[in-house]
């Protein structure tokens, strides 16, 4: 099992010019770990991270799009898996931070957690490849290859909460952040 923030720090070290879509707890962590105008971060639309990332991947096929989803969030929109697989964006990397809870909603346990796999669901939906990591060294060693692999791919990251970064809702929802993202997207 990996600490979520440590897992995201590994991604930040390997990141070049990818668009990163992060939701909920991963978004709160990500804006502190890897600030960038190419971060698309939000909360308040549980389950929609993968759909937003799909739109960006289709709109910018020249740029790699990495979505940092939560397991509870993905469960709120499982239909996105077949939609993503059908669209088949080669530039799409779907990371699921799996901790077995709806963490944002008070760490409510996910019913029947452990009796299904996100990699299995993604494979059945039609994702090109799926991977599972529960060890930081393995994640670090494989990440450069994953960031270049044709997608859509799903990466299940077995995590537990790490450092508790302060919530920064004004940053997530500011018009300044939105405008900087649009400008960075247009200029990249």
Language model regions located:
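Feature captures the catalytic ectodomains and active-site-proximal regions of enzymes
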Residues: 1
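Short, polar loop motifs at secondary-structure junctions
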Residues: 24-27
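Thiamine diphosphate
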Residues: 4-9, 19, 31-187
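Extracellular glycan-recognition modules
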Residues: 15-17
């Amino acid at each position: 099992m990996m600490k979520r923030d440590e897992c995201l720090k590994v991604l930040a070290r390997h990141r070049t010019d990818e668009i990163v879509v992060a939701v909920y707890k991963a978004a709160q962590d990500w804006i502190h770990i890897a600030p960038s105008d190419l971060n698309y971060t939000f909360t308040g639309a549980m389950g929609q991270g993968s759909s937003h990332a799909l739109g960006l991947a289709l709109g910018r096929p020249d740029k790699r799009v990495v979505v940092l989803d939560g397991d509870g969030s993905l469960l709120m929109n499982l239909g996105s898996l077949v939609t993503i697989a059908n669209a088949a964006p080669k530039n799409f990397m779907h990371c699921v931070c799996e901790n077995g809870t709806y963490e944002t909603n008070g760490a409510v346990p996910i019913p029947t957690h452990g009796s299904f796999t996100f990699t299995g669901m993604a494979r059945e939906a039609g994702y090109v490849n799926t991977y599972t990591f529960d060890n930081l060294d393995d994640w670090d060693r494989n990440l450069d290859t994953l960031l270049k692999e044709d997608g859509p791919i799903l990466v299940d990251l077995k995590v537990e909460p790490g450092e508790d970064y302060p919530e920064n809702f004004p940053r997530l929802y500011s018009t300044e952040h939105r405008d900087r993202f649009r400008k960075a997207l247009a200029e990249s």
